[in-house]
Amino acid sequence: MNDTTATRCGYVAIVGRPNVGKSTLLNHILGQKLAITSRKPQTTRHNMLGIKTEGAVQAIYVDTPGMHKNGEKALNRYMNKTASAALKDVDVVIFVVDRTRWTDEDQMVLERVQYVQGPVILAINKTDRIEDKSDLMPHLEWLQGQLPNASIVPISAQHGHNLEALESLIASHLPENDHFFPEDQITDRSSRFLAAELVREKIMRQLGAELPYQITVEIEEFKQQGRTLHIHALILVERDGQKKIIIGDKGDRIKRIGSDARRDMELLFDSKVMLNLWVKVKGGWSDDERALRSLGYGDL
């Protein structure tokens, strides 16, 4: 970010269709893993704040679920509502799109972003993979026509290409404000929430297309005992068949999930972690508004 004598602070919404690179972008800006990622759409389910303070500038990023068309369950409605709500009361909107690909879900996000009154930045992701940059021009010109007042910044969320320019532009749009959070705080989310998300990420990465999205993780115990952090996590699925898939042959799969999650937790929490995982069937939870609220999904 640019150095400035003025103290600046504001909220920055990161929006886009599922699996376009929003969470990867947030993690790279923060310089550490905070938001979970996988190649599967709809990995992110909640708005999460990622806070970066650099000098006089504090940018508070809101990582959002990908807006999507398919899915009529209560969980899908929650995710779309959550993402749309992030466009309100923020100071800057980053609309992440692919370098060439445009889908109906991109169009759905665009139609919401067009109503935004404040600054909009189009972050064109994965542009480092294009050898001849002139191939980008037709897509960029079309996008500029859809959002005439938006700034366009080509980036690579994965490799960090051009993120310094993106952050500098964001900083220039933030209002003069005292900082809302302490300098060393990087998120508004609890350690329990982050632990649950890491377990869910490893499940999605291990299973891929084998497992539908009717899965969530609840932390039942989170306790520091001496130098070891003891975490008990409950994995909720909707059918017995899903439970068997997660556990795997002789428990091999759930052991790999636990091992991978524990490794990331130890880095995040800077502590030795003892992680225990259980799998429980709770039929229909993803379409049960009361169950969703009890699991921390808020109002639907």
From Swiss-Prot:
**Organism encoding this protein:** Pseudomonas savastanoi pv. phaseolicola (strain 1448A / Race 6)
Which ranges carry the KH type-2 domain?
Answer: 199-283
Cite the SUPFAM superfamilies for this sequence.
P-loop containing nucleoside triphosphate hydrolases, Prokaryotic type KH domain (KH-domain type II)
GO cellular component labels: cytosol; plasma membrane
Gene symbol? era
Recall the taxonomic lineage recorded for the source organism. Bacteria, Pseudomonadati, Pseudomonadota, Gammaproteobacteria, Pseudomonadales
Protein name according to UniProt: GTPase Era
* Region span, G5: 155-157
Main location per UniProt?
cytoplasm
Q: What is an example of a GO molecular function annotated in this UniProt entry?
A: ribosomal small subunit binding
